[in-house]
Amino acid sequence: MDLRELYQDIILDHARSPRNFGALSEPSHLAHGHNPLCGDKLTVFMKIDDDHITKVSFEGRGCAISTASASLMTQILTGKSVAQADAVFAAFHARVTTGAAVEVASDLEDATERLEPLTGVRTYPARVKCATLAWHTVDAAVKGGVLGTTIKTE
């Protein structure tokens, strides 16, 4: 697989027209993420109510893979519980880092399938950090709350 194959239609669509792009007013949780290898920088904004993610958005700049992953992530996580978000992240992370398919609850299968276009980054280790930056940032936001944590994928 060459790098051009990574830029599938869905990746390009989300990179060119990211969904849920922009800051949320009064987020309950936020975090900043930075991938110094590629230059990706983003901030994730979340509203979590009663352990459920009611809204999630992001803003920042990054490569096509980073932007597409963040865009897909915002769509997938909205309406999920924090535990479900953790499960989707764990499955996605395993898939892009080791190629392992992690079983998820049946109600999360669609979420992990929607991330499949990004799994080709596994053969390009530097690009794995691009694909997972938004997910690590959401994890930091959930754990750090409204104070805003900064993470780096070095």
What is each of the regions a protein language model found here?
Residues S69-S81:
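Alpha-helical support elements that line or immediately flank enzyme active sites
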Residues G60-T67:
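Short, thiol/selenol-centered motifs that function as redox-active sites or metal-ligating centers
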Residues S17, F21-G60:
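Structured beta-strand/loop patches that form or line metal/cofactor-binding pockets in enzymes
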Residues M1-G22, K80-E154:
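C-terminal binding/interaction regions
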Residues L42, S71, K129:
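Active-site phosphate/pyrophosphate-handling residues
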Residues C38, I65, T123-R127:
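Secondary-structure capping and boundary motifs in well-ordered enzyme cores
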